Amino acid sequence: MSACQTPVIVALDFPTREAALRLADQLDPKLCRVKVGKELFTSCAADIVETLRHRGFEVFLDLKFHDIPNTTAMAVKAAAEMGVWMVNVHCSGGLRMMAACREVLEQRTGPQPLLIGVTVLTSMEREDLAGIGLDIDPQVQVLRLAALAGKAGMDGLVCSALEAQALKAAHPSLQLVTPGIRPAGSAQDDQRRILTPRQALDAGSDYLVIGRPISQAADPAKALAAVVAELA
């Protein structure tokens, strides 16, 4: 497998294997990793991960596990056995849940995926948090959950680029994975707390998840190359 040379992760947010592979076949695994989320994984199961890995891609399995500690840890173990490069869980599952996931990975031999915690979804603003009983600014909740993740030994966090600078300052060892990235001139779609790729890296993000600006471009390979050029 050729190691990816950029921080770009392209979201394969498609309902079918055929559609996902149609895009993947236009992308260079040296220029990006790929993200498999709930829709595609539910449709295709582990086969899509194996297929993408055979095409040379490192895979971020974005299923945001959130359950009791043992159940979540076993799901993370299963993901590791698929050979994924990165897997995530919801930090709101708590310290014991995240620590159980860390422990199960450390008990394995061989390569371990990066274990990433999800703080506050980038679609959520203060009014959304208030609706679920958290009448606080999203960044406050992000910092609370980040502290738990650090204590549990997580490798990093999924966060908005707008939270990246504060998180790097508070937790410099955590790798930051940022969705909601939109190259200049792109539509915001349903993401709210967004920055451009260059802005996100400058703010402290380590990996950038980009979906529709590449997947729905007339020429996805050209769109990916433009993002990589922006980061050079």
Curated annotation (Swiss-Prot):
Give the EC number(s) listed in the UniProt record: 4.1.1.23
Q: Where is the active site?
A: 64
* Gene Ontology MF terms: orotidine-5'-phosphate decarboxylase activity
Pathway the protein contributes to? Pyrimidine metabolism; UMP biosynthesis via de novo pathway; UMP from orotate: step 2/2
The cellular component terms of Gene Ontology attached to this UniProt record, alphabetical and capped at eight, are: cytosol
Kindly state which keywords UniProt assigns to this record, in alphabetical order.
Decarboxylase, Lyase, Pyrimidine biosynthesis
The cysteines covalently paired via disulfide bonds are: none
Q: Where does substrate bind?
A: 13, 35, 62-71, 122, 182, 191, 211-212
Pfam families from the entry? OMPdecase
Q: Which family does it belong to?
A: Belongs to the OMP decarboxylase family. Type 1 subfamily.
Entries under NCBIfam families matching the protein:
PRK00230.1 (NF001273), pyrF (TIGR01740)
HAMAP family, sorted: OMPdecase_type1_B
Q: How does it assemble?
A: Homodimer.
Q: What is this protein called?
A: Orotidine 5'-phosphate decarboxylase
**Organism lineage:** Bacteria, Pseudomonadati, Pseudomonadota, Gammaproteobacteria, Pseudomonadales
Q: Which gene encodes it?
A: pyrF
